[in-house]
Design a protein with these regions (language model features):
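Catalytic nucleophile-loop/oxyanion-hole region of alpha/beta-hydrolase
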Residues: 63-68, 91-125, 297
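The serine-hydrolase catalytic nucleophile loop
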Residues: 61-74, 255
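Catalytic active-site module of serine/aspartate enzymes centered on a nucleophile-bearing elbow/loop
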Residues: 275, 280-335
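Short beta-strand element of the alpha/beta-hydrolase
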Residues: 51-61
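An N-terminal hydrophobic leader/cap segment in hydrolases
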Residues: 1-31, 35-45, 315-320, 324-335
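Short alpha-helix in the alpha/beta-hydrolase fold that links the catalytic acid
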Residues: 239, 253-263
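Conserved alpha/beta-hydrolase
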Residues: 66, 73-97
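Short beta-strand/loop motif that positions the catalytic acidic residue
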Residues: 237, 243-245, 249
Length: 335
């Protein structure tokens, strides 16, 4: 690791100057169909001539943007890891802001961006990290027949709340809205969830000019389709992969996450369970990497990446969050 900061210490102060700051993009990903996706980059201060030891493509969640990584990215950069965080299609400052492009299209965008990073940094380890919707997108990317060559996936609370895990009233309401008012834009409504215990991070998300506050019904339907696809693809995710989940997640139900984790574990069997790792945080919320205790998952992510770079995927995580993670998640479902 480079620098004097231990993982987690570099983000104790808010990593932005103003709550409503519009930070210019660092550059553009130009994709094969002509789409240009803006990205922010956080680079290590002391970078070797042949590039950083690792590069992370970081994908944000629904209605979020490239700014989703303002808290974790400086910590990764302090550890010598470059973070490249694009606005996904339909979000942030992308050309199709506010409209849904399809989960498969987004998965292929991610694959294309990972290949571009591999070309640009041929001597670096390439990782893909996704939060919430971004994690679901990467689960599809990992199961493409021509999936890009990456060194590992980090999936923080991937969005897996598909129709099969919704009650019939919610499924029926969504079906009716999609067939009657698909273009209507909906606000957050009366129901409030606590996405993180970091109040400043939530205020920043609400004031960020790149955040979308009113969502088209058909975009909601598209995200649910994506979650269905991600849940179905779970047994076939090609590792190495690290799944992160917090006990206080109010957006992705424990039952849905346990279904995915259990399917992955069954697919690989007891003798190959280190290919995909699971970490369960008793104090964590949905936005784990922005939480007050984000130092714990950040330490784990960096340690896991360093283990992969050293040819090991079986080193215990520093926080101990991987100890009996599936069993602890299963036990917590009824609480």
């Amino acid at each position: 690791m480079t620098g004097d900061n231990e993982p987690g210490q570099a983000v104790m102060q808010a990593p932005f100057t103003k709550l409503n700051a519009l930070v210019p993009a660092s550059g553009l990903f130009r994709l094969a169909d002509g789409t240009a996706l803006p990205y922010r980059a956080w680079m290590p201060a002391d970078m070797p001539k042949d590039g950083p030891w690792a590069v992370v493509l970081a994908l944000h969640g629904m209605n979020d943007s490239r700014d989703a990584w303002e808290y974790p990215a400086p910590v990764l950069a302090a550890a010598g890891i470059a973070v490249i965080a694009p606005d996904q299609r339909g979000f942030g400052a992308s050309p199709s802001r506010g409209y849904w492009s399809g989960g498969e299209a987004m998965a292929r965008d991610a694959a294309a961006m990972l290949r571009l990073l591999r070309q640009r940094y041929p001597h670096s380890r390439i990782f893909a990290m996704g939060e919430s919707m971004g994690g679901a997108v990467l689960m599809l990317t990992a199961t493409l027949h021509d999936a890009p060559a990456v060194d590992g996936y980090i999936l923080s609370a991937p969005a897996l709340w598909g129709r099969s895990k919704m009650n019939i009233a919610l499924r029926s309401t969504l079906w009716l809205a999609l067939h009657t008012i698909p273009g209507a834009r909906l606000g957050p409504g009366p129901v409030r969830v606590k996405a993180s215990d970091n109040r400043i991070a939530l205020i920043r998300l609400g004031h960020d000019p790149l955040t979308i506050h009113k969502t088209r019904v058909d975009v909601i339907g598209g995200v649910v389709d994506l979650m269905d696809q991600a849940l179905e693809s779970a047994p076939y995710v090609k590792g190495p992969a690290l799944f992160l989940y917090g006990a206080h997640d109010e957006l992705v139900p424990k039952r849905a996450m346990h279904t995915a984790w259990a399917a992955l574990a069954r697919e690989r069997g007891a003798d190959d369970n280190v290919e995909v790792r699971f970490a369960y945080y008793p104090d964590g919320y949905h936005l784990l990497l922005r939480d007050q205790r984000r130092d714990l998952p950040m330490q784990d992510v960096i340690a896991w990446m360093m283990g992969i770079a050293g040819g090991r995927n079986d080193i215990p995580l520093p926080s101990g969050a991987d100890h009996d993670a599936i069993a602890r998640l299963r036990a917590a479902q009824g609480r």
